[in-house]
Design a protein with these regions (language model features):
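Conserved long alpha-helical elements within nucleotide-processing catalytic cores of c-di-GMP signaling
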Residues: 1-22, 28-32, 36-37, 43-53, ...
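A short, conserved beta-strand element in the Rossmann-like catalytic core
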Residues: 4, 70-71
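Cyclic nucleotide signaling catalytic output domains
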Residues: 27, 54-58, 64, 68-69, ...
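A general secondary-structure signal for short beta-strands and their flanking turns/coil
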Residues: 32, 73-74
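Short hydrophobic/aromatic beta-strand micro-patches
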Residues: 38-41, 79-81
Length: 125
């Protein structure tokens, strides 16, 4: 698949993300095929788990592009406040490590970041 077709698929993924979250959530593209979602006022980890499972279902699809079928899926790393700190960089790093765990395990899933240890947490706040 060429760059133009790949960009079209990424735009469709961005639209899926935008339409899957609340208006108060922030959805953005970090670059390449990586996106970020910042969710506020989360009542429980179960709400996030439910959103992740729904999103993975929406992302599992096959596109026809240039006469070829292209299958996509998603992998999600999740970091929560205050478990991983409050600063964006630390939350991003935790989510990135969780994402790596998903990809290492075979992709197509989600993982919550581990809680930061007390020394890391003190640095993060």
């Amino acid at each position: 698949m060429g760059h133009v077709q790949g960009d079209l698929v990424l735009r469709e993924v961005a639209e899926i993300l935008r339409s899957s979250f609340r208006k108060t959530d922030i959805v953005g593209r970090l670059g390449g095929d990586e996106f970020i979602v910042l969710m506020r006022d989360i009542k429980s980890q179960e709400n996030v788990r439910s959103s992740a499972e729904k999103l993975l279902g929406l992302l599992r699809r096959t596109y026809k592009r240039e006469g070829r079928e292209v299958s996509i899926s998603g992998s999600i790393g999740i970091a929560m406040v205050p478990e991983c700190g409050r600063k964006f960089k630390h939350l991003y790093d935790c989510a990135d490590q969780a994402l790596y765990s998903v990809k290492y395990a075979g992709k197509g899933g989600y993982c919550f970041a581990e809680k930061a240890d007390s020394r890391q947490k003190a640095e993060q706040e």
